[in-house]
């Protein structure tokens, strides 16, 4: 009985050790950190309030809090995020999220990140449906995401200010 107890104790300790090591290996997949502030060319300022929450101050006193959710569409460094309005501060929305969600390819940059729009959660969003089909059919997901970013003219580039 004592040998069995020692064996179970050793196996439990090994399992816990492996879990701790693996949990420590996983880094954040987003190219920003909490409390960082970024600015785009339209003078929108994004403050990262949590890994999945942004506060955006735009022109003409527009300000809102957004929820930023990861999706299953990921490559090595590029990923797709769904952005929704959590709270409009002054009754306005600087990112103009019309439907429940707007989908963007989040790409790391040297001094920040970029957001490339790829559709909305509206049921008739042809752009989002085409993206989903193309992604599912792509063998190299990262290469597909890079091509999508290169093919879209409208891209918001945010540079770190602090």
Curated annotation (Swiss-Prot):
Keyword Membrane: yes
Keyword Zinc: no
Coiled coil regions in record: none
Top-rank lineage group of the source organism: Bacteria
Chief site of localization: membrane
Membrane-protein topology: Lipid-anchor
Compartments where found: Cell membrane
One Pfam family matching this protein: DUF5512
Protein name per Swiss-Prot or TrEMBL: Uncharacterized protein pXO2-32/BXB0031/GBAA_pXO2_0031
